[in-house]
Each structure stands twice: as structure tokens, then as C-alpha cells.
């Protein structure tokens, strides 16, 4: 399932840079024996927008162009992918160059205030976390317990860097039980940003998030709620966003909007 789609339109040109996702090291186990194993190949990526340095992200590097596009989207620096002419990633220098068509309006003002969040130690967002939250309107999407169990099984069967090297988080986008996109990174905020970038390059039906289900490993932090609904359960309740956590096998907890979940106690 490739995250890249070529529409032959005026969507951004992407460099499609590649880098190894894991590297081998030697470790000593509890018996004093040396073992060769794989660990995630975390690397720094400095993002430049129209030659202006914006931020440095620590990333696995699986789909860096989509990460950068989604980061700019979720930071509300862009409102459309068509504002971007190209994204070029060069791993030799650890940099991503974003070229826009007309620049980003008031970028200095928009990036002047940075809020550090709880996202894996490096999470941060520009501006007010709560800005425009009241204007978000969600559709009437829901899911059944059977769909929930189905998507959890799909995650369990998914081939992943986590299974081979550990120490990464995974995020996925579902339509019902059908997995549309699965992304891993060293931080969940990176993974959801990458999915946000991926969605922007898809057809209109896939871009529409109102009927989709978002899955993430780890905790449902305020940053994850903001990015998936665009802050904690309190905000999820206010928006009517259904937040389900501690989901494994057939156990889960629904923290907000339980009316969106069709209960099936017979399962």
C-alpha cells in the first residue's frame, strides 16, 4: 500500500527520498552474551519553507515529504496542498526544502508562539492549542463493535518496523475495517502528520475525514485529539469525537461520545 498517488495535476512535486528504517547494533543480554539486533534509525530532518528555517523533526524517515506536508497542515500554516510547489528531501544534509507558490501569509506571526505538548517528549505546536476548536463540526459517523475488533485485528496482522525493531509508534486510518494507510515513526505526532499529508494527496472521498477511523498506539494525548479532529477527553466531548482507548483483543474503554459506537454485547 504505497502512500504516494500520482494524479498528474498541480499537486506538490515530491522528491520521494529514501533511507533505511532500521540499523543493526550489538547488544549484551542478561547472560552476558552478545546479540546482533535491529533498532529504529532515528534521524533529524530540518524543514525550510521558502529558504526560511522552520523546525527540526526527529523522524524514522519512512515518508519524509508526506510528514512535512502534514506537519504544515496540522500546524495550520497551510490550508491546501496546492499552495505548495515542491517538497525536496536530502538525507545527505538532513534537510527538507519546501517551495510554495506565493509564500505563507504572516508566517512570522503564526510561528512566533510555540506550545510544548506531551507528544513523546518533542511534541510542540505553533499558536493557540484551542484556536478555532469551537468552529470544528464533525459528521455523524459511527462504528460497530465488530468494526472495532476488525480494525484491531488488522493492526495485529500488519507488518511493521515495531515487530522487527521495536521503539516506534504506529498510526492508521480506516474506512470501516479497511485500512487505508499505516504509518510508523519514532513519535505518534509524526505518524499522524504523515497521514494528514497522505490524505491531502488522495481523491476527494479519501480526503474526507468525517467518515474515517483514526488509530494510534500509545496514549490519547491532547495533541493527538487536536490533530485527529482539528484536547484531552474534555475537548473530545465538546466536539462529539468518539475516543476509544486501552483497546486490545476484545477489551476497550470508550472515553467520549459513546453514542457513536453501536454496542454488540453478543460478540
Model-found features: residue ranges?
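Conserved catalytic-core subdomain
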Residues: 220, 224-267
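Cysteine/selenocysteine-centered motifs that mediate thiol-based redox chemistry or coordinate metal-sulfur cofactors
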Residues: 89-103, 208-238
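Glycine- and Gly-Pro-enriched alpha-helical subdomains that act as flexible
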Residues: 161-218, 230
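Extended, folded domain segments that form the structural surfaces/walls around functional sites
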Residues: 141, 152, 189-193, 225-235
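Short, solvent-exposed amphipathic alpha-helical segments in soluble enzyme
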Residues: 62-63, 72-73, 188-189, 197-200, ...
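Generic structural signal for well-ordered alpha-helical scaffold segments
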Residues: 156, 196-200, 225
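Solvent-exposed alpha-helices and their adjacent loops that cap or buttress functional pockets
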Residues: 37-40, 89-90, 161-166, 174, ...
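Intrinsically disordered, low-complexity regions enriched in acidic/Ser/Thr/Pro/Gln residues
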Residues: 2-170, 174-175, 181-182
